[in-house]
Amino acid sequence: MNRVFVFWVLIVCLPTMVANAQEDSELQRSSDEHMREELGVNPITTPSIHDTLKQLEVFRPVPVALIDAANREATFNNRFQTALHFGSLVADGFLLTLAERPQAIQDVGKALIRQSRALGVGERLTKRSKSLLEHSDKGDWAGVRQELVRTQEDVETSMLELRDEEMAHMISLGGWLRGFQLGANCTADAYSPAKARILGNVEIMDYFLDRLDTLHPRLKKTDMVTALTARVKEIRALAAEAADKTMTREQVEKIRDLANAAEDAATAKVDEEGRFEKPKN
């Protein structure tokens, strides 16, 4: 008797339960979209990894030596540089899939776990990074790329939950800057108009310059942010000189040097006030 009663209760209530679940799901999506707009998280803030890979595919041969020279073990005493470094590691992963370097990709995956923990999103990314390592070990480059896509999706979700606008933008900036630096070095070493055209996108430069300009005044005055902003402005000015034309090899070489300097500023050791530390003798 009790079972029959429960059965009919479920039959009567099920449509309402389903409708409520659908409404809750729609409310959650609406809430997420509102937070994305509020935090400035849009296709430019967190560009699609798939689209980014499509652009990076032209930068061959991959400057593997420059990627390997980076200190993946680097740690920083501030969230600004930690976020930049996280984005930089993702960009390295992009290029390494093109070079098909499984061990290097595994090293990047491990570094991503460490940096994600430093940013407070480690729990979400630990499983994702482990999956990335497994695909890399098998030489499944399509799988690696898919995991990178999912990694960025997880980061975006974490940014929404943390409501940390600056971290969202700086991770994106770090990825763009590193990808730009590697692309500029590749183009300077093996120039082609197709590569040079990709480097000339001033709109994305304007976007990140605007993001840097909205940082807290105290952070904007630090050596690291001042130097980074200055280099990006110089890169933007050189790219704008070409206007609708393709940048020449000479222009690309200048941009390469500025991109290297910008990445150096992003990864430089600084004190608690954001001042560059002097090299120890």
Locate predicted features.
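Bacterial N-terminal signal peptides
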Residues: 6-16
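Boundary at the C-terminal end of the N-terminal hydrophobic targeting segment
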Residues: 19-21
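Short, charged, amphipathic alpha-helical segments
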Residues: 106-110, 130-131, 170-173, 195-200, ...
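A cross-kingdom marker for long, charged
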Residues: 216-281
